[in-house]
Amino acid sequence: QSEIIYVGTASGGLWKSTSGGVTWEAIFDKQTTSSIGAVAIQQSNPSVVWVGTGEGNPRNSLNGGDGIYKSLDGGKHWIKMGLEKSRNIHRIIIHPQNPDIVYVAVIGSPWGLHPERGVYKTMDGGMNWERILFTNQSSGAADLVMDPRNPNKLIAALWDHHRDPWFFRSGGNGSGLFISHDAGKTWEQRSDEDGLPEGDLGRIGLAIAPSSPEIIYALIESKKNALYKSTDGGFKWKLINDKDEIGNRPFYYSDLRVDPKNENRIYSIFTYINVSEDGGRSFSELMPAYGVSNGVHPDHHAWWIHPDDPNYMMDGNDGGLNITRDRGETWHFAQNIPVAQFYHIAVDHDLPYNVYGGMQDNGSWAGPAYTWRVQGIRNSYWQEISFGDGFDVLPDPDNSRFGISASQQGSAVIYDRLTGYNEGIRPTHPEREEKLRFNWNAAMNRDPFHSNTLYFGSQFVHKSTDGGQTWNIISEDLTTNNPDYQKQGESGGLTMDATGAENYCTILVIEPSPIQKELLWIGTDDGQVHLSLNGGDDWQNITTNIPMPTGAWINQIRASNHNPAEALLVANDYRRFNDAPMVYRTKDFGKSWEQIVDKNDVIGYALCVLQDPIEPNLYFLGTGDGLYVSFDGAENWNKWTAGFPTTNVMDLAIQPREHDLVIGTFGRAAYVLDDIQPLRAIAAHPAYLDDPVKLFQ
């Protein structure tokens, strides 16, 4: 039944096609997580589908899960089958003769130590689980394969790794390659005595040749990353290739696939897709990263080959899903799976108004919120306005043709939507030897009283009064400036990986008041909060007034439209293994704060908050599991479920003319909740909820 396809996404849930990839349906929208790390179909009864939650590639934007799920009816209904504390699951293998036996490779969370890692097994269809392979609390199962001719033979790769907000370590004594010949009862670890590299190992990717299961490939991260091969079923190993062509960034990729009909044809899945026709001794590029016309996005994470027709393959990458029927000569991109990961969202005042936002690894875009055409909004109506990992977009309020767009590590451009022209305006320090620190998602904002005045955050606050052409520094270093957290050049562990994703001691939030000139709120990634009442001439550190964990990540600050002394602050600490939601409110310029959201109100950590600019009792909240609304000034919260999935809600904006709530999600693209005036009426008159019917003008 190859026309039935299931696709798991990093933070956009599970999708199903019954038409070979022509049409798609989201089938995992009501669960408590939208992050999918593994999918397995019971081939003897394809209506039985297993899903492991929590993506398995632990970059800085990683999403976690809450266990393993099972469906008996092709995804119409789901049952949680346990492993709730596993956080991230990367592989599921169903026994081909006895489907009650299922193996799960739990990679676990990189953000903290926990024992729910390693390889798990159930013998009763998920009712009970046994951990059958484990080394330590920082090591998880990065890969797991089964011999197709002998289901009692398993090969597992354990990976010792840890992530801090400011550093990543891959490799340690908990890593290793393990083989079991008795269905996981006992395991033997392979070592340098068997031909594997000496010393600590990092991430390992495994592949068994289906046509010749005695041939096994292992892509091993060590002091020198290399591809190893066994021709005796895993007893002895030999290094066959250590060139760059085998792959890169092992913490993020490390997947291999072998052609089911040809044991010498190997696909290495990484930034590119490289293929070997000689058993790994050499590779050629099947899909380069850029400069080709096949329309396939680079950065690949999932690869499937039809077991009977190796020309039919599917590729999952940072840009979506692609399908080929001719072994990579041509590709079809599935344009109807809306799983974009927005960091920020914005609107303009055109008619129809446009929605703007920056996406993880897919640039920054602009497109209409609605259209008067019968076909509705088409993908072609949207325009990429700048390249890179997209973050904040600030459309010019006076002329929507122009605006400012940010990308990773403090890059920013002036864009022209008509011509496509981009002009870089990244701030620099007047003393060239002074190094600026920009977060992966650096702070950027526009002054609400002077549209040509911009603010940008490094460790300093930068201000421009000429639209970004020139910049002045208007603050001291507002971070802790802790040197122990500024060693990003050493980040990566066995393989250096210094892309800027771990930049730390940086400014994340610059929030000017919309109703009082020169009032600025500042938040940093290392938990510092500052306030200026005079446009940056003087700064107050108000951090200790906030009852939050020391060093918590300041994700957002919202200055009130009703009271200049009032602001909302969103902090989260999941990067230090604390998922508690934290939203605070001050009404006295930061002298005191009250917590208005905690774990009794919502599920998961908080990401964004918005008080309605018209009705002060109406609040909206975005968390790791969705959208919440309060009608009573944040006293009580209700999850919004009608027409809206479980997903990360990263940012919120209100279009004032049309009273629309625009929602930027990290996994399900952007939504518009049309005309919230009825919600304002309910917040202003709570008794309306007791009326059986209420009409609104």
Annotate the PLM regions.
Residues 1-697:
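Beta-propeller blade termini and top-face loops
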